[in-house]
């Protein structure tokens, strides 16, 4: 792990604000510039933390959980008062938490769900196609992740509005609002209370565990013992967040690109078989999330003198755009191959729902282009995006409509 021959005598220090609101695209430009200046650096934001910027170093950190622990995954919060399960666990317990869920989120299970997901995506596009304009973030990107999540869990659509409301409040923590953290904390509590009540109901009135995720989890084992209710609730909160807010953000960026790049949009209309490849490229070129790790012991990481309990931002956002790995890394090439991006992480903690997310991202493009093949971004001024989890605040789109007889 030590490689001091090319390391500077003293690691660089900087103050990089990666959480503020800025014009769309600015966050990646800043990350790209930092990566080319520093292989790693100490960021003086909050309590201070290391930032790894290069693809190979980041993969190594993901693959070394005995040094880079998941006990905290937010760089500015080394000792969180809440738990994301199974995200906040390391091997070997991590796989014990994931094991009951693996089959549910497997490629085969997602394929069986795809016809229902397509229906839901089509319904959301049909609801706005005749309007000729929409804020994509407040319409499709708001609703489809919720309906897709409820469908994937085997839940009815009755509570869709509740989940949309909670998702709004939980997504505001890095958007700059004065009360954002308080609103997010309150929404977290509301979501935990919801799943606590739902779990109690499933224990009293179980449904078919082959189609109802919560019934399946109510019987889940942690090794040889029943999984505690508090752990099941924490898992449900984590799955909710991962299914709603992150998917909404990624949906926004792929449509932002297609609304600004008519040649790519026309090519996907003419060659829809390229849409899966385009989704992978949008994930690579517009990576929205970076993970953090907590150092378990003093270590020299390729010349970087990390101390026990230091926080490290393991920047997927930087790795996915590293020109040492990706030719023309700053360009979007919708048929790029190979494409070894790590937008979903790497190693054991790779995103559990990645197959579901890929299907939803693909179906969103397929169904939109089927009804609205010609559209563009309407904003005259640069759009704004919040940092942290990089997400557009709005995305106004316009398109020609066909008069109905």
Where are these regions (language model features)?
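Cytochrome P450
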Residues: 1-405
């Amino acid at each position: 792990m030590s490689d001091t021959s090319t390391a500077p005598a003293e690691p660089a220090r900087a103050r990089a604000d990666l959480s503020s609101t800025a014009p769309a695209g600015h966050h990646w430009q800043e990350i790209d510039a930092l990566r080319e200046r520093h292989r790693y650096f100490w960021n003086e934001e909050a309590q201070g933390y290391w930032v790894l910027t290069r693809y190979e170093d980041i993969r190594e950190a993901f693959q070394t959980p005995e040094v880079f622990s998941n006990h905290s995954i937010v760089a500015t919060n080394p000792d969180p008062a809440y738990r994301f399960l199974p995200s906040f666990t390391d091997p070997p317990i991590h796989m014990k938490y994931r094991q009951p869920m693996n089959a549910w989120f497997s490629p085969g299970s997602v394929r069986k769900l795809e016809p229902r997901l397509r229906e839901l995506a089509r319904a959301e596009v049909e609801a706005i196609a005749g309007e000729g304009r929409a804020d994509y973030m407040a319409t499709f990107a708001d609703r489809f992740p919720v309906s897709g999540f409820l469908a994937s869990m085997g839940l009815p659509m009755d509570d869709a509005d509740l989940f949309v409301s909670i998702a709004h409040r939980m997504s505001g923590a890095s958007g700059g609002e004065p009360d954002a953290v308080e609103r997010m904390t309150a929404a977290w509590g509301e979501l935990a209370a919801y799943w606590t009540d739902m779990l109690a109901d499933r224990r009293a009135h179980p449904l078919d565990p082959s189609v109802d995720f919560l019934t399946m989890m109510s019987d889940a084992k942690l090794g040889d013992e029943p999984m505690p209710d508090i752990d099941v609730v924490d898992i449900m909160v984590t799955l909710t967040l991962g299914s709603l807010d992150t998917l909404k953000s990624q949906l926004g960026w792929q449509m932002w690109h297609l609304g600004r790049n008519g040649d790519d949009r026309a090519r996907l209309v003419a060659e829809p078989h390229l849409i899966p490849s385009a989704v992978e490229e949008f994930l690579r070129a517009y990576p929205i999330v970076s993970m953090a790790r907590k150092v378990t012991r003093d270590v020299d990481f390729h010349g970087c003198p990390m101390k026990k309990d230091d926080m490290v931002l393991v920047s997927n956002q930087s790795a996915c755009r590293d020109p040492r790995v990706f030719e023309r890394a700053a360009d979007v090439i919708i048929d790029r191959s190979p494409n070894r991006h790590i937008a979903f992480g790497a190693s054991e903690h790779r995103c559990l729902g990645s197959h579901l997310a890929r299907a939803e991202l693909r179906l969103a493009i397929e169904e939109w282009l089927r009804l609205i093949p010609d559209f563009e971004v309407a904003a005259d001024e640069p759009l704004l995006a919040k940092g942290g989890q990089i997400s557009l605040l709005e995305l106004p789109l316009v398109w020609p409509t066909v008069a109905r007889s």
